[in-house]
Amino acid sequence: MATASEILKQIKENDVKFVDLRFTDRRASLQHVTMDVVCVDEDMFADGVMFDGFSIGGWKAINESDMVLMPDTETVHMDPFFAQSTMVIVCDILDPVSGEAYNRDRRGTAKKAEAYLKASGIGDTVFVGREAEFFVFDDVKYKADPYNTGFKLDSTELPSNDDTDYETGNLGHRPRVKGGYFPVPPVDSAQDMRSEMLTVLSEMGVVVEKHHHEVAAAQHDTLVRNADELGIKFKMQIYKYVVHQVANAYGKTATFMPKPIFGDNGSGMHVHQSIWKGGKPTFAGDEYAGLSESCLFYIGGIIKHAKAINAFTNPSTNSYKRFVPGYEAPVLLAYSARNRSASCRIPFGSNPKAKRVEVRFPDPTANPYLAFAAMLMAGLDGIKNKIHPGKAMDKDLYDLPPKELKKIPTVCGSLRQALESLDKDRKFLTAGGVFDDDQIDAFIELKMAEVMRFEMTPHPVEYDMYYSA
């Protein structure tokens, strides 16, 4: 871990002008405050920086609004997008009275989950990798007032532009609906932009792997290595930040909404997970697909608590528009080797170090700290209570006959159902004080307000179906 004096030395050597203190709010959005370097000294690293917690939705009442941003010296990196030389430091949120971690700080929850894993004796390290898909549009317009509600998206890749007149002519090369996976340019119009994203991510300390066009028109995926422990090192937030910034630099707009377009594939965030102990993988063994019994129990915990986990892994009303059979969405709670129609997939790999579980139902609107911590707690509950996931489902689950299909449990069908499931099934989360009831209740209250707004707002489709009734 770098010391405050070492970071101050870096600031001087790199002629840094500003230090940007960042944290993640309850809705998984990045927040920041920028400090002039004249204010950055060893006292700042020891005492932190005060800020108004009341102005961050759902955190503190106005009569107790003071909170502390405590810089984490392990998270230092430079921001390549700012005009002035700026160093970024991720912060934990502390209570100024007790000096302890604030219980509603998501990053603190992830740290508690890691500590709980170590205390359990099951493992000492959890590795989490993620594949977060996204869309990039040329133009987006939306309105949500009482007398004008709707949205309009545009991208040269959209099939709706087949007959659009452009000044330079319509060149015609674009993906078809559900036909955009892996084409070369010119059908893939974003090759250079995605390469730029990976280049910037690498410069910011993220170990990158590959990128490609995804199934839907205007949909993309860039992959980074599985080297983060519960997202604590901020890699997922850096990833989303870079995607947004690079797209913006190209004159485009990126979104991690799970289902921005009806009738085409949505965006997921597949989360790869494995537990290690003493430098050895605990998920490798002699059971199904080369897994250990412990790994099967981990999967059993994920499946048992999936509906409660959905509140954290799929925390938007839009998340549940993605859960439709036929669009590669992992609706069914089953596990299988290589089978992408199962919600828990075992990627192929002969090396024991590669043995892992890929949970496919999360999406990129999730707060990574909460989502990763919740999945770990569910998996550990499965191991502790020996929850076997049952028989693997190696057939195409999308083609099962209705009678057989009804026997397989599913993810939640709405955010309301997910929040209700979380309210009823929370004991596995509060084990070891990782989550607490105040935090869970506050999260449910915050998200239920979104549900109510969504449910009470007339939808353009309702006009299409019912206006002439």
Curated annotation (Swiss-Prot):
Positions of post-translational O-AMP-tyrosine modification: Y398
Alphabetical list of SUPFAM superfamilies matching this protein: Glutamine synthetase, N-terminal domain, Glutamine synthetase/guanido kinase
Positions of ATP binding: E209, H272, Q273, S274, R340, R345, K353
Any Pfam family matching the protein: Gln-synt_C
Catalytic activity as recorded in UniProt: L-glutamate + NH4(+) + ATP = L-glutamine + ADP + phosphate + H(+)
Residue positions binding Mg(2+) 1: E131, H270, E358
GO terms, molecular function: ATP binding; glutamine synthetase activity; metal ion binding
Free-text comment on the cofactor: Binds 2 Mg(2+) ions per subunit.
Annotated ranges, domain GS beta-grasp: 14-99
Enzyme class: ligase
Cofactor(s) this protein cannot do without: Mg(2+)
Activity regulation summary: The activity of this enzyme could be controlled by adenylation under conditions of abundant glutamine.
Residues annotated for Mg(2+) 2 binding in this entry: E133, E214, D221
Function comment: Catalyzes the ATP-dependent biosynthesis of glutamine from glutamate and ammonia.
Subunit structure: Oligomer of 12 subunits arranged in the form of two hexameric ring.
Protein name in UniProt: Glutamine synthetase
Organismal lineage: Bacteria, Pseudomonadati, Pseudomonadota, Alphaproteobacteria, Hyphomicrobiales
